[in-house]
Each structure stands twice: as structure tokens, then as C-alpha cells.
Amino acid sequence: MAGGKAGKDSGKAKAKAVSRSQRAGLQFPVGRIHRHLKTRTTSHGRVGATAAVYSAAILEYLTAEVLELAGNASKDLKVKRITPRHLQLAIRGDEELDSLIKATIAGGGAIPHIHKSLIGKKGQQKTA
């Protein structure tokens, strides 16, 4: 084998690449989140390797939580498609998510709420 690279890679099969998302057992893209964290920091792109994994895990958990609650809301209304209205009902119905997500949801509508002092007691007659 003239001019060959016989010593290098002699009979070993190259291992298949495993993504960081697969290693962490996540669905969200750890590599992409790491890239976005690097471009949006002021410390010259220095971001720890576990920061992206942790951020991806948090985003995945919050997304799963919101989608589960919105799915329950759509099931209660007997429809199969989640709409912005279902997302709005799910987020505003959960106290912790409501405090976390203060954004206005386009197409979400208004949350029905009647103050307790306006609701009459049972058997109480309205006087005219």
C-alpha cells in the first residue's frame, strides 16, 4: 500500500453520531438552543455545555404542560383541534402559568369572570 494510510483507521468502524438531544433524552434541539444562547450573550459567546441542555429541558417541560392543559380544554369543549382560545383558557386557568406567561394571546378571547360580590346568594330575590 504505497502512500497509504494503513495505520490510520485500521478496521475500526466509525461510531454513529448521537445528538445531544438524544443523549439528554429530550425532543427539543439542544444544539440549536446552544447556538442561540451563544449569539445572544455578551460574554463573547461563552456558554456552558450543560446550560443548553438545562434550557432545552425547561422549554420542553413548559411546552408539554401548556399543551396538556390546552388538550384538556379542547376535549372539554368536544373538539379535536387546539386553538388559541384553548391555549388562553389553559394558561389563564392555571395560577402558576398565568403568573409566568403575561403575554396577550392573539385570538384567545376574554376569560369569563364574575366578581363574587356581584353573584347573588341562593334564594335571594332581586328587589325592584
Curated annotation (Swiss-Prot):
Keyword Ribonucleoprotein set for record: no
Keyword entries, A-Z: Acetylation, Chromosome, DNA-binding, Nucleosome core, Nucleus, Ubl conjugation
Entry-linked CDD domains: HFD_H2A
UniProt keyword ATP-binding, yes or no: no
Region (Disordered): 1-23
Modified residue annotations for N6-lactoyllysine: 12, 14, 116
Post-translation changes: Monoubiquitination of Lys-122 gives a specific tag for epigenetic transcriptional repression.
Biased amino acid composition, Basic and acidic residues: 1-12
Gene Ontology CC entries for this record: nucleosome; nucleus
InterPro entries: Histone-fold, Histone_H2A, Histone_H2A/H2B/H3, Histone_H2A_C, Histone_H2A_CS
Similarity comment: Belongs to the histone H2A family.
Subunit structure: The nucleosome is a histone octamer containing two molecules each of H2A, H2B, H3 and H4 assembled in one H3-H4 heterotetramer and two H2A-H2B heterodimers. The octamer wraps approximately 147 bp of DNA. H2A or its variant H2AZ2 forms a heterodimer with H2B.
Function: Variant histone H2A which replaces conventional H2A in a subset of nucleosomes. Nucleosomes wrap and compact DNA into chromatin, limiting DNA accessibility to the cellular machineries which require DNA as a template. Histones thereby play a central role in transcription regulation, DNA repair, DNA replication and chromosomal stability. DNA accessibility is regulated via a complex set of post-translational modifications of histones, also called histone code, and nucleosome remodeling. May be involved in the formation of constitutive heterochromatin.
Protein name, entry field: Histone H2A.V
Organism: Oryctolagus cuniculus
Record gene name: H2AZ2
